[in-house]
Amino acid sequence: GGTDFMLYNDGGTFTHNSGKVLFDDAGLSNGSNIRNPSSFHDVEIALGSFSCTAHHNMTCTGTFLVTSGTYSDGSNGFHIDELVTIKNGATINLSNSTTQTKKLGALLVESGGTFRACRNITEFDGSGAGHSGQPSALEVESGATFNNNLGTCKFTSAGDQDIEMDGTGMFYNLELAKTNNDVVMHANVEVENNLTIDLAADHTLRPASTSNTVTVRGTTFIKEGKIGDTTAYNGTNNWGNLVMKSGTFILGSGTNNFESIRNKGGTIS
């Protein structure tokens, strides 16, 4: 908002020196802006009741923390190598662009925090320490809000990635596109549209506990990889329309509901 800038770099040299840059509300009377074509290392946003908008790509080689206020990407890039954290009362709004991809190492939305995903693709390519001690690529705590913005959340790390959706909100499209290791879902995960599985052939989507459930309201696509290996889905699960190009679907001992099944080369066991 407005024309005031807390940092305006229009082509000068900015060296992060592996330090943290803090943007706070000291002296602010309204919202402000940030423009920096260079990379930050760590960034903290502490704006109280105010907001800030990026006027260039936000790139961090470390972490991005919003303790208070609202950060909006202004339809510019958002690429954070490590953990993004949103504290109680704080908000991150990624853009409504239908062509951009935003990249986060991992995301923790604490109770009272709000995250709005990108309308196109929000990619998670790392993992962080979850409340259960597992490497949570995405953790939405109880009391937090996750707004899918009708976009796709894509998980791509070569390591294990945990998904913990304990707050309000569900995925729209969820894509698991990994060359190695598993995806572990905690609690009960809902996908408003489509779930796409594209994992290494010997790796799997699995629950943290056999009682955890999945609800897909559109289509479950299995391009490669497995569902339900190592730990089975033994509760009542709804997979929508199942389309298998390859891969393996291992049915648990519970109830698996399908709207339709089209198996073009996979295995159901």
Identify the function of each model-found stretch:
Residues G1-E190, T196-S269:
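Extracellular beta-strand-rich, repetitive "passenger/adhesive" scaffolds
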